[in-house]
Regions:
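Helix-turn-helix
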Residues: 3-37, 41
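Short, structured helix-loop boundary elements
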Residues: 14, 36, 40, 65-69, ...
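Short, basic, alpha-helical segments at the C-terminal edge of helix-turn-helix-like DNA-binding modules
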Residues: 14, 44-51
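Alpha-helical DNA-contacting segments of helix-turn-helix folds
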Residues: 39-46, 93
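Hydrophobic alpha-helical connector segments
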Residues: 41, 55-85, 139-143
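Amphipathic alpha-helical packing segments from all-alpha helical-bundle domains
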Residues: 51-56, 88, 101-128, 137-141, ...
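Amphipathic alpha-helical segments used for helix-helix packing
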Residues: 82-103, 152-156
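Hydrophobic/aromatic-rich alpha-helical bundle segments in the mid-to-C-terminal region
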Residues: 103, 126-172, 182-197
């Protein structure tokens, strides 16, 4: 993963990987048939770690009804911070998911290790049926892939690693531009109407 971060997904060679690992290229070929197989195994390794976040998480579905945005945030923050804590894995994962062969690979792979996360999503679908109207590929590209992309920008130093960045990314992912295209006058009106309800 460190080699992909340094040389890019297409530019990395088995020789680069073996040098960083401190082994001969031949030693890698004893375990992997090709660079592509090694990349897929690395992806699966990191993907399973990301799925493990949700396996350990305490999730109370009732929170969706009382504070849906906080329920989403309680799932999103650990996922985002997972990527911030792993710079090499984050850059690798983003580049692998962004590659031309990923969509076909993604449709054919076994991702059953995400079953707990899928169960959480189904609870959201039941509470908010309008989520089913969204193209699911587009929804997950927006939420999960964009989260990894923003984390990549943070670990590469393009965005600052601070609370303001985290809050802004979450707000942008959940509200989009419409959350920012409100004048102060409209914002005050909304606040007043909420307070009178």
């Amino acid at each position: 993963m460190k080699a992909v971060r340094q040389y890019g997904l297409e530019g990395v060679r088995i020789q680069n990987i073996s040098k960083l690992a401190g082994v001969s290229p031949g030693a890698l070929y004893r375990y992997f048939d090709s660079k592509e197989q090694l990349m897929m195994e690395c992806f699966t390794y990191v993907d399973k770690q990301a799925a493990g976040i949700f396996d350990c998480m305490k999730f109370d579905p009732r929170n969706m009804l009382t504070d849906p945005m906080e329920a989403v945030r309680s799932l999103w923050v650990p996922y985002f911070r997972f990527w911030l804590a792993r710079p090499d894995e984050t850059v690798f994962y983003h580049r692998f998911r962004d590659s031309a062969f990923f969509p076909a690979y993604d449709k054919s792979r076994d991702a059953s290790y995400f079953d707990r996360f899928v169960g959480m999503v189904q609870v959201f679908w039941e509470a908010f049926p309008n989520l089913r109207q969204i193209n699911q590929d587009l929804l997950w590209l927006h939420v999960l892939t964009s989260t990894v992309m923003y984390a990549k920008y943070v670990v590469e130093g393009v965005l600052p690693d601070n609370q303001e960045t985290e809050d802004t990314i979450f707000r942008f992912l959940t509200e989009g531009l419409s959350g920012y295209l409100i004048s102060d006058k409209d914002k005050n009106r909304k606040l007043q109407s909420r307070n009178t309800e």
